[in-house]
Amino acid sequence: MESMNNQEILNGTIEYVSRSSKLLKKVSDITKEKIKDYPYLDDLTEEYIQAQHLYDRTPKLLKLLSEINITDAIISNEVIENINNMKYELDHLIESTQFRIDDIDTYFKRVETEYFLKDKKNEFYVELSSYNSQIQDSLKKLKSIYDGGKLLTKEVSEINRKKFKNSDKVLTKHINTGIALFIILTSLLVYFIQFKPKISQD
């Protein structure tokens, strides 16, 4: 794998997030048109729309995570407050993403059971099944990014809390810890790009 700098990793991930959002828009438009034929698509369509909102919120958050500076977090209460706010937002995004994963699975299976259990070669079902698998795979990878971001913000907050107890050693020890955590996060971003599902450009 070619060496990538942090900005390339970030740009590539944001590009993928954008394409994932477009895929969800495309699929929800398709299912909207089919609701009249398959009414149970209504709930599945709504879940796709809600999932798209997650992707639309992600680029800004990824940029903020990539800009975390451990030294600033140690010496600035304002910076640590912003990091704590990111941690709360990540908690919400992790929970919301898991809800989307679970609900999409539930509603897709309901559509499958109601309409296609005996007709799995149906052209629309085959198309929907393929798209749905891509969406679920993408959401799981998105959640792994949020999990990595939460780990980073949690540990930075802990570093800030401990600085008062160990101020003489905190800079060297915890700056190194911060670098290690950032490597964990960027490694997840690389995984996100390298092993992304194939997303149709149609």
Curated annotation (Swiss-Prot):
Subcellular compartments: Membrane
Bilayer disposition of the protein: Single-pass membrane protein
TM ranges: 175-195
Major subcellular site: membrane
Superkingdom assignment: Eukaryota
Origin species: Dictyostelium discoideum
Keywords: Membrane, Transmembrane, Transmembrane helix
One Gene Ontology CC term in the entry: membrane
Protein name: Putative uncharacterized transmembrane protein DDB_G0288997
